[in-house]
């Protein structure tokens, strides 16, 4: 594959993956090469070759930026070659046209023109052709790289200071909707209040949240709006938990009070029954003593009546048993 001598077409682009297939083909200067007939392995090899050529090719824009910054900076691509471009085994041998038809849901035979198939599938709405699709969109939709891995935030090594003589600088990231990617519950005001200290080397945050390159010690800590937003979000939940806990404590106290009252009433009932039984026992013992005394008196009275007044004369006397 032959590249243009000056490489200006590629150097003017911020990323090769933002080029469409037609632009990429014209930038390479190989109009006779048909990307649709290539398989996915050949397409990736061409992209990687163009990446290496773009990194080596001198560009006027890069030279002027290097003069302002102080040293040359290597262009950071939104899709990393080593970690994210991994072809599945079933996809590596497919041609670009076959993959594009699978993406668009056209199906059809291999000899069918992709543009004609797209026009026949949706006559009311014009479908984009393969040449109008960017490389990044094609790779993401084909499943070569996940969409979240394709999104990369680049922090430049220097940014304009907000206050002279301080290391607090204006954020270099452009937030489209005022929200930080991957951070939930951060208001636009909190995102605008963020400040980032300038690192000595570029710091790249890829889509997986991994920090690549640079010195992390120069980054300033997260400011207070994050904590405020999280506290506001967690407030109602904490209040509900406390309210449920208080209601549970009140119910437990009421249940314990009812249990103590039932126990006390049962004890008092038992004590009353014991006292009543004691009184009955005392009365029965008294009646028993009276009955025994009455029986004894009746027995003595009968004996007296049978013996009469001579009963006292009967007594034992000693008889003479010795020799006369």
Swiss-Prot record:
Q: Name the Gene Ontology molecular function terms of this record.
A: DNA-binding transcription factor activity; sequence-specific DNA binding
Q: Which GO terms describe its biological process?
A: abscisic acid-activated signaling pathway; positive regulation of abscisic acid-activated signaling pathway; positive regulation of DNA-templated transcription; regulation of DNA-templated transcription; response to salt stress; response to water deprivation
Q: Which residues form the signal peptide?
A: none
Q: Does the keyword Nucleus apply?
A: yes
Name the segments for region: Leucine-zipper. Answer: 270-284
Tell me the compartments it is located in: Nucleus
Keyword terms, alphabetized: Abscisic acid signaling pathway, DNA-binding, Nucleus, Stress response, Transcription, Transcription regulation
Q: How is it modified after translation?
A: Phosphorylated on serine and threonine residues by SAPK2, SAPK6 and SAPK9. Phosphorylation is required for full transactivation activity.
Residues annotated as region Disordered? 106-127
- Phenotype of the disrupted gene, per the record: No visible phenotype under normal growth conditions, but mutant plants exhibit increased sensitivity to salt and drought stresses. Decreased sensitivity to abscisic acid (ABA).
What is the predominant subcellular site recorded for this chain?
Answer: nucleus
Compositional bias per record (Low complexity), positions renumbered to this chain: 115-124
* Purpose of the protein: Transcription factor involved in abscisic acid (ABA) signaling pathway. Transcription factor activity is fully activated by ABA. Acts as a positive regulator of the expression of abiotic stress-responsive genes through an ABA-dependent signaling pathway. Acts as a positive regulator of ABA signaling and drought stress tolerance. Plays an important role in ABA and auxin responses. Involved in ABA signaling and stress responses by directly binding to the ABA-responsive element (ABRE)-containing genes, especially WRKY family genes. Modulates response to auxin.
Q: How does it assemble?
A: Interacts with MODD. Interacts with SAPK2, SAPK6 and SAPK9.
Protein name, UniProt field:
bZIP transcription factor 46
Q: Which organism is it from?
A: Oryza sativa subsp. japonica
Classification lineage: Eukaryota, Viridiplantae, Streptophyta, Embryophyta, Tracheophyta
């Amino acid at each position: 594959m032959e590249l243009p001598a000056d490489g200006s077409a590629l150097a003017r682009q911020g990323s090769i993956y933002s080029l469409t297939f037609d632009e990429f083909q014209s930038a390479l200067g190989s109009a006779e090469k048909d990307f649709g007939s290539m398989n996915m392995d050949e397409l990736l090899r061409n992209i990687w070759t163009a990446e290496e050529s773009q990194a080596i090719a001198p560009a006027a824009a890069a030279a002027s930026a290097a003069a302002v910054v102080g040293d040359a900076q290597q262009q950071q691509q939104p899709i990393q070659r080593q970690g994210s471009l991994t072809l599945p085994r079933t996809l590596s041998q497919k041609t670009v046209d076959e993959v594009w038809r699978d993406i668009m849901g056209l199906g059809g035979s291999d000899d069918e023109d992709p543009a004609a198939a797209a026009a026949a599938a949706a006559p009311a709405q014009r479908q984009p052709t393969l040449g109008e699709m960017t490389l990044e969109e094609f790779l993401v939709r084909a499943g070569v790289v996940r969409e979240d891995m394709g999104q990369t935030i680049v922090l430049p090594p220097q940014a304009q200071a907000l206050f002279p003589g301080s290391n607090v600088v204006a954020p270099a990231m452009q937030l489209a909707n005022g929200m930080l990617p991957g951070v939930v519950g951060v208001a636009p005001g909190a995102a605008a209040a963020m400040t980032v200290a300038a690192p000595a080397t570029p710091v790249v945050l890829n889509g997986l949240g991994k920090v690549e390159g640079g010195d992390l010690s120069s980054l300033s800590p997260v400011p207070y709006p994050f904590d405020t937003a999280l506290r506001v979000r967690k407030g109602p939940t904490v209040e509900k938990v406390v309210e449920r806990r208080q209601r549970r404590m009140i119910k437990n106290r009421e249940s314990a009070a009812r249990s103590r009252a039932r126990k006390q009433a049962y004890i008092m009932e038992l004590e009353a029954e014991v006292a009543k039984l004691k009184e009955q026992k005392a009365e029965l013992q008294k009646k028993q003593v009276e009955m025994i005394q009455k029986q004894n008196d009746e027995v003595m009275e009968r004996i007296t009546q049978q013996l009469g007044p001579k009963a006292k004369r009967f007594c034992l006397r000693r008889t003479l048993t010795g020799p006369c």
